[in-house]
Structures are given as structure tokens and as C-alpha cells.
């Protein structure tokens, strides 16, 4: 327990920008030395974590390739162009962009990509600090919560899928509609909450993405030469269609029993090969841009949680929660979703969802109850965790990026928004999940 809490403190604190994989590794070594996890357990952990890590890493590599030829700047310029000088339209389009980035990539990648671009756009528009906050806050909340509809947008969701033995296709069939309704509900709440602070008109802007290109504002540097303007839109639409095809292929692979990580790797390889041929950009940049630490972080965090599991922590949770969730599907849905939300805000959603999933596997429940508890846990982990900034790694990354660019949104300002938005959204989404599963899957 001590190793877990010390590790979480350093992950939240991150002194001098310390990579989160480093304290997680030291924590895992402490657990191994204490004997809470055996060498045999490491092999089982590897089988659970490797596939999810490869899938997420392949997606991040695709994001790096897309950034290198200006795809995201092009998207941002189109967003501004379509807003047509309206701050209201820009709000809705910003949230749509953040949603799509998470759906096509993943939540952490979406934050890394959209936050610097939004900061650049908002600075370019000359908005005041109180006018920027609605776009930045709604963007991070929607980008992070958008990992709920499909399992491949969050590494912990993928790991939990493997633990519970549920395929990606079934997860999406059961989860997509209720979580999308929850996201729409959240966006509407955010719009009403921020309406008075949104600028009603914006200055005129050029549509071409080169006007937005600014090296300092993006963490993935060294873009290649700009595309010829006449070919720009055609090529970008082709790339967008390809990324969409790859995402759809992941679900097709899950449905047909093909390896999902293999499909993700093939998609990344094709995009990188095309970039090399068309733009003459060597894949060497991936050696220093790719987030290789994802493997280490995912593996070592799993070791820590497995240690808690082995010393009886999940048995304790089972003794408390099994009588509650066994009562009815409604009890199972709301008790699981709310408890995972609380754990996520106390410990971060990565360990919270793993603990919840381990606890679920120890319960003797019927298949329907098991599935709805798992999905409710996802809602608590992906949406409920947003109540506090430390609830997700994505929000911590977001705050770090803001600080890098001399922007600041305090914990107080963040919580002032989320204390209203998040509990209502969690309850609404859990209600949608309960009725959706009851009507169509029972």
C-alpha cells in the first residue's frame, strides 16, 4: 500500500517535469522486492498490457506522422473558417474537433495535439483570458470524456477489456449510444454554463493553415515543408479518410477475431511509408518523438495494482460491493459508476479502473450484471474522473501545457466548472446506459 501511495504522489507531483513512467517503475520494483508480485505474475501482466500498449503507441505514431505535414494546422484553420466570425460557432466546432481527435486517436494524444493548437488560435484571435477559458475548459473535458464511446481511445479501457474478456465490438455496441448521449448532454451543459463569457463575434481570419503555423506552440516539432496550396485539401481529405478506415478496421478486426494491435501497427506502417514516399520524410523522427514510455508506464502501473490485488485489497472491496451490486441492474449501474468516479478522483483513473476491474472479476455475478458494471466503471473512469484535475493523466498534461505557454487555469476555476457539469453528466450517462442495456441486451 505504501509503494502505491508514494508512487501516486510522485505521478501527480511530477517534480521538474519527471516522466510518470519513472515513479511507476520504482513503485513496481518496490512491490516486486516486497514479494507482493511474483516473477510468474509478470508474465501474466505482460499478456494483458502488451496488446493495449501497442495499439495506443501505434495510434500516437500516426498522430506524429499527421502533425509532421501540417494536418492538424489545416484542421484548425478549417475550424476557424467554418466559425464564420462567430464565437458561439467556434465553441461548438472546438468541442467537435476535440471529440474527433479522441475518437480517431486517443485522449492523451488529443490533449497533446488540440491544446497547443487551441492556444495558438485563441492568441491569434486576440481573446482575453476570461474569453479563452470556455474553449480551453470545454475542450479538455470533451477530449478526455470522449474516450468512453469506443474502447480504443484509452489505454486503460483496452487493458480492462482484456481482463474482463470482452471484445471491442461488443463494448462499442453496448457503450456508444449511452456515452454519446452523455457527451451531448455535457456539451450542452458547458454551453449554458459558459454562454455569457463566449465572445459573440470574432475577427476575420484567413483560411489557409500556413497562417497558423508557429513552431513554439506545438510539442511535436520539426514539421516538413508546406504542401502546395492547390493539393492541400485533396491530400488532407485523403489522409482523413485513411485514418477513419484504420479506426473502422480495428472494430472489424475485433469482430472477426483478428489481432487489433496488428491492424493498428499495419495502419501506422502504411501511413509512415506514404509519408516517406510522398514527403521524403524519414521515419527517424519517430525514435525521439514516439512516447515509448507508454509501455513502461502501463506495465508498471499494472504491477502496482496487481500487488494490491494479491494482498487482499480487492477481496475487501468485493465484500463491501458484491451485496450492493447483486440487488438489481440499477444498483449495479449506479453503485459501480459512482464508486469508480470517487476512486478515480482520489487515486487517478488509471489505477481506479484497474482496481474496479479486478474487483469485478472476483465477484460471482451473472454475465449481464458483469457487463453493465464494467461499462459503468468506464463511465466513472472516463467522465467521473474529471471532477478534479488529478483524476486523469490527460488533465494533468493539459495543465502542464497551459503553464508552458504562460496560460493558467487554477484548480479553483477548474473545479468551479466541473462541480456542476461532471456529477450531472455521470448520473445522466449512467441512466442512459441502464435503459440502453435493459432494452436491447437483456
Curated annotation (Swiss-Prot):
Bilayer-crossing regions: 22-42, 56-76, 85-105, 107-127, 136-156, 174-194, 250-270, 294-314, 328-347, 378-398, 419-439
GO biological process per UniProt: response to arsenic-containing substance
Protein name: Putative arsenical pump membrane protein
Coiled-coil regions listed: none
Gene: ywrK
Cellular component terms per the entry's GO annotation: plasma membrane
Gene Ontology molecular-function annotations: arsenite transmembrane transporter activity
Cited PANTHER family: ARSENICAL PUMP MEMBRANE PROTEIN-RELATED (PTHR43302:SF6), TRANSPORTER ARSB-RELATED (PTHR43302)
Pfam family membership, one: ArsB
Keyword Cell membrane belongs to the record: yes
Family as reported in the entry's similarity comment: Belongs to the ArsB family.
Keyword Membrane among record annotations: yes
Compartments where found: Cell membrane
Main location: membrane
Amino acid at each position: 500500500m505504501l509503494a502505491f501511495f508514494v508512487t501516486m504522489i510522485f505521478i501527480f507531483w511530477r517534480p521538474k517535469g519527471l516522466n510518470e513512467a519513472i515513479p511507476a517503475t520504482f513503485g513496481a520494483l518496490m512491490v516486486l522486492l516486497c514479494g507482493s508480485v511474483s516473477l510468474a505474475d509478470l508474465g501474466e501482466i505482460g499478456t494483458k498490457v502488451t496488446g493495449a500498449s501497442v495499439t495506443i503507441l501505434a495510434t500516437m505514431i500516426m498522430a506524429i506522422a499527421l502533425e509532421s505535414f501540417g494536418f492538424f494546422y489545416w484542421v484548425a484553420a478549417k475550424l476557424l473558417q467554418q466559425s464564420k466570425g462567430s464565437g458561439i460557432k467556434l465553441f461548438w466546432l472546438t468541442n467537435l474537433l476535440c471529440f474527433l481527435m479522441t475518437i480517431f486517436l486517443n485522449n492523451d494524444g488529443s490533449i497533446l495535439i488540440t491544446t497547443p493548437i487551441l492556444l495558438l488560435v485563441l492568441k491569434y484571435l486576440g481573446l482575453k483570458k476570461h474569453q479563452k477559458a470556455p474553449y480551453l475548459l470545454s475542450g479538455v473535458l470533451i477530449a478526455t470524456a470522449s474516450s468512453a464511446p469506443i474502447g480504443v481511445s484509452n489505454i486503460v479501457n483496452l487493458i480492462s477489456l482484456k481482463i474482463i474478456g470482452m471484445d471491442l465490438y461488443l463494448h462499442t455496441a453496448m457503450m456508444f449510444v449511452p456515452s454519446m448521449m452523455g457527451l451531448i448532454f455535457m456539451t450542452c451543459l458547458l454551453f449554458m454554463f459558459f454562454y455569457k463569457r463566449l465572445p459573440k463575434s470574432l475577427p476575420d481570419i484567413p483560411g489557409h493553415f500556413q497562417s497558423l503555423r508557429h513552431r513554439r506552440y506545438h510539442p511535436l516539432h520539426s514539421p516538413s515543408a508546406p504542401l502546395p496550396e492547390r493539393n492541400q485539401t485533396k491530400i488532407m481529405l485523403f489522409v482523413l479518410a485513411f485514418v477513419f478506415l484504420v479506426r473502422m478496421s480495428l472494430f472489424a478486426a475485433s469482430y472477426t477475431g483478428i489481432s487489433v494491435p496488428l491492424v493498428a501497427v499495419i495502419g501506422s506502417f502504411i501511413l509512415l511509408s506514404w509519408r516517406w514516399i510522398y514527403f521524403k520524410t524519414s521515419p527517424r523522427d519517430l525514435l525521439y518523438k514516439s512516447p515509448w514510455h507508454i509501455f513502461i508506464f502501463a506495465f508498471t502501473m499494472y504491477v502496482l495494482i496487481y500487488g494490491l490485488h494479491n494482498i487482499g485489497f480487492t477481496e475487501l472491496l468485493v465484500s463491501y460491493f458484491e451485496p450492493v451490486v447483486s440487488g438489481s441492474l440499477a444498483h449495479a449501474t449506479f453503485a459501480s459508476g459512482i464508486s469508480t468516479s470517487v476512486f478515480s478522483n482520489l487515486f487517478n483513473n488509471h489505477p481506479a479502473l484497474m482496481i474496479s476491474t479486478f474487483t469485478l472479476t472476483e465477484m460471482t455475478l451473472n454475465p449481464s450484471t458483469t457487463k453493465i458494471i464494467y461499462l459503468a466503471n468506464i463511465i466513472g473512469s472516463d467522465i467521473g474522473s474529471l471532477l478534479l484535475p488529478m483524476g486523469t493523466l490527460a488533465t494533468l498534461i493539459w495543465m502542464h501545457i497551459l503553464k508552458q505557454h504562460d496560460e493558467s487555469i487554477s484548480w479553483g476555476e477548474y473545479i468551479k466548472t466541473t462541480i456542476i457539469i461532471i456529477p450531472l453528466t455521470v448520473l445522466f450517462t449512467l441512466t442512459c446506459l441502464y435503459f440502453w442495456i435493459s432494452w436491447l441486451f437483456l
